[in-house]
């Protein structure tokens, strides 16, 4: 996920983890964006605080080298229903979800035993487990605990005074 910082989304993810849902997030480090060096906001302060508030949530960083993990991909696996994927252009920030940017997302419900969900599972597991390469890093490798960064993220997310 490129940007994940919208308060309601974070809370819903945390509450799902508390209910026993296996929530796994692979997020961009927000250290680079389109050739410019960034300070890690919003993902690092948002997701590190999410982990502190909800211990059962699982988060890894996508390991980038000057590029960004620009993915906007959410995949839901259910016990008794068909899998669902949400794909598109929207980041999960207030500015994007409250229509400040023109974005399009698509919800794709798939047959449980079809090729698409199997391929999505395989892709996610490869990244999560670093199968065949070094794709992701533990959350702790780039843990953001600075008070200033946490406050800055919250102010920017709340007001929309940011580029994300």
Model regions and ranges:
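Short, glycine-rich nucleotide/cofactor-binding loops
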Residues: 1-6
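PLD/PLD-like phosphodiesterase catalytic module centered on the HKD motif
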Residues: 7-164
């Amino acid at each position: 996920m490129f940007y994940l910082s919208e308060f309601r989304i974070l809370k819903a993810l945390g509450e799902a983890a508390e209910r026993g849902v296996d929530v796994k997030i692979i997020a961009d480090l927000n250290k680079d964006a389109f050739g410019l060096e960034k300070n890690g906001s919003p993902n690092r302060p948002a997701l590190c605080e999410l982990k502190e508030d909800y211990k059962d949530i699982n988060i890894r960083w996508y390991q980038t080298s000057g590029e960004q993990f620009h993915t906007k991909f959410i995949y839901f696996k259910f016990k008794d229903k068909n899998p669902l994927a949400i794909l598109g252009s929207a980041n999960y920030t207030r500015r994007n979800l409250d229509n400040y940017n023109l974005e399009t997302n698509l919800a794709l419900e798939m047959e449980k035993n079809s090729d698409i969900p199997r391929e999505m599972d395989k892709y996610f597991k490869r990244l999560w487990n670093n199968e065949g390469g070094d794709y992701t890093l533990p959350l702790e490798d780039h843990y953001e605990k600075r008070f200033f960064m946490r406050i800055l993220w919250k102010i920017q997310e709340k007001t929309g005074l940011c580029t994300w």
